[in-house]
Amino acid sequence: MKNTDEKISYLDLFFCPKQNLYTYLEIYKQYSPNEKAFTNLILYFIANVIAVSKESQLLVYQSGLFGEIASSINLSQDPIEDIDVKIFFLSQLSVSSIYENDIMFSLQLQKIYFDIILLREELLLRDEHRDITYILNNSLWGLANVSFCENDTFINNFIKFDIISYIINSNSKSQVVLNPSLKIIGNLLSNKEEFVNKIISPELFHYLIENICYKNNDISIKSIGLWAMSNIFSDENQQKYIFQYNLPDILNDLFELNFPPDSEIDKEIAFQIGKYIEISNDEAVVVLIKKYDICSLQKKMLEKYSYNLKNMCHIYKCHLIMTSLIGIVSKNGEGGKLAVEIFNKNGMTDLIERVILQCSNPIDNEYMKKKVEEIEKMGEIILDEYLSSDTRTISNDDNEDI
């Protein structure tokens, strides 16, 4: 066994951790399990390396260390400090291919994270002088990383242990808790439809709305909250929620906050507008237009993002807005007619012509180039088939209600 000075010299490796990952792994194997304090420190170093490197995550997984740590956790006997560093280490694993290809390991991790949440009071009583907040938070991150796994065991455990209620009733407003919590909810809502219907509740909507609008000014929290909410809307059965919670007004209020053009939040607003239109029947589209003035919001967003179609963020947002535009004007029935009439009156024709002109700018990135080509095609379809058409007009009586 090496002496303390030699062990301390290993800490110099921390200053270039990625290059020394193999050395970390060797050190851990050499000292484990006899010197827990030192190996906990090395495990903490490894966790920080893999947190920023997916390549390193795969390397550590292949070394067997993830499986070793997961199997070594004993929640009923391990000291809190040991549980803390082990859960932090495991929660940094985010490479989806590992979960997809190793179902047993995925289920093992899920059980650990579920057990920690269920045993939180017991863990707190074991050592009243130690804060278990980070253990709980890292367990949420771990669950967030595996929450996309579409297996019945995972879904049934969420329902059985009522993890959603635990998340919703958490008093924390910190990004540390909200980010993984909203990611879990979003992943679950994008899962099986029968599961979605089991967890949708007024409490869930209020939780999402509060975190999108009020509790936290962090743009990333608002963005991931909007993304999570968007996953609720998959078909006409969910259109009632749009109006029950006045969600279009929330989108408009958020857009009026004028977030920086490169932020994610306007992308999520544009995406959610498209979802509302996609799942709405004719009657609902009329409400979106007449009560919530959704056409004006679409125009304002297109005006903001149609000036620079060489910027990747602008291209994404413009593509989403154009998708929602073609979605609403192509609706059959009164809703589509109303949208065409409004866009013909509010200058949308000139705006879309400007968008098409912007599409002629050269783009280096092939993926973005394809997106711009799709924007141009959508613009031409809207102009040729809808806004320039004389066949889709509405009566003067209807016109007075717009």
Where are these regions (language model features)?
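Alpha-helical solenoid scaffolds in eukaryotic proteins
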Residues: C16-I27, F45, S63-S72, L107-L119, ...
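Helix-loop junctions that connect tandem helical modules in alpha-solenoid scaffolds
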Residues: T23-E35, I69-E81, D115-D131, Y166-Q175, ...
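Helix-start/N-cap signature of alpha-helical segments
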Residues: Y31-I42, L58, Q77-K86, D102, ...
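Alpha-helical solenoid repeat architecture
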Residues: M1-K7, N40-K54, D84-Y99, N137-E150, ...
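Generic recognition of well-structured, leucine-rich alpha-helical segments
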Residues: T4, Y28-Y31, V49, S53, ...
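Elongated alpha-helical scaffolds that mediate protein-protein interactions in large eukaryotic proteins
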Residues: M1-Y22, T39, A51-G67, V95-Q110, ...
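Alpha-solenoid helical-repeat scaffold
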Residues: Y241-F243, P248, D253-L254, P260-I402
